[in-house]
Regions:
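HIT superfamily nucleotide-processing domains
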Residues: 1-149
Length: 149
């Protein structure tokens, strides 16, 4: 179900830590991070103008981290719709920092960027996170304990 107002997004309802409070967006740490530094840039209005400004600020943030040598590169992107993996039905931009050597064999793949083996396989079966993760991600089909369909 699409969320109608910014005040109703889970990050606000759960009083999640706000890392940056910009004019058009807020930045929160991702509750299910792919790696350290995985952030969500969330526009305050669901409009093209606010989404565009949020994307622009995400890029500026990443470029600054690269220019200052804090990271080597970054991914950013949006999941639009449940089939694409969206679980919070309000636009938000994922920012995933990257470091040289963080993935063996296939550098650059965001699917392999999970430090400490985090991702669906980790959160979906971890005793501390399993119930909440599966509730928030109902579209993932769990075959049995230990395997994704």
């Amino acid at each position: 179900m699409m969320i109608r107002e910014f005040k109703d997004i889970p990050f606000e309802l759960n009083n999640q830590e706000v890392l940056i409070d910009g004019e058009h967006f807020r930045v929160y740490p991702d509750a299910w991070p792919a790696c350290d530094g995985h952030l969500l840039f969330v526009p305050k209005l669901n409009t093209t103008e606010y989404i565009t400004k949020t994307l622009s600020e995400t890029i500026a943030y990443g470029d600054n981290l690269v220019e200052t040598g804090k990271i080597d590169g970054y991914h950013f992107g949006m999941n639009m719709g449940e089939p694409a993996g969206q679980s919070v039905m309000w636009p938000h931009v994922h920012f995933i920092p990257r470091h040289k050597g963080d993935v063996e064999g296939f550098p650059g793949s965001v699917r392999l960027a999970h430090r400490g083996h985090r991702g669906s396989e980790y959160y979906g079966f971890h005793p501390e996170h399993k119930d909440e993760y599966r509730k928030v991600h109902p579209f993932i089909k769990w075959k049995d304990e230990g395997e994704l369909e």
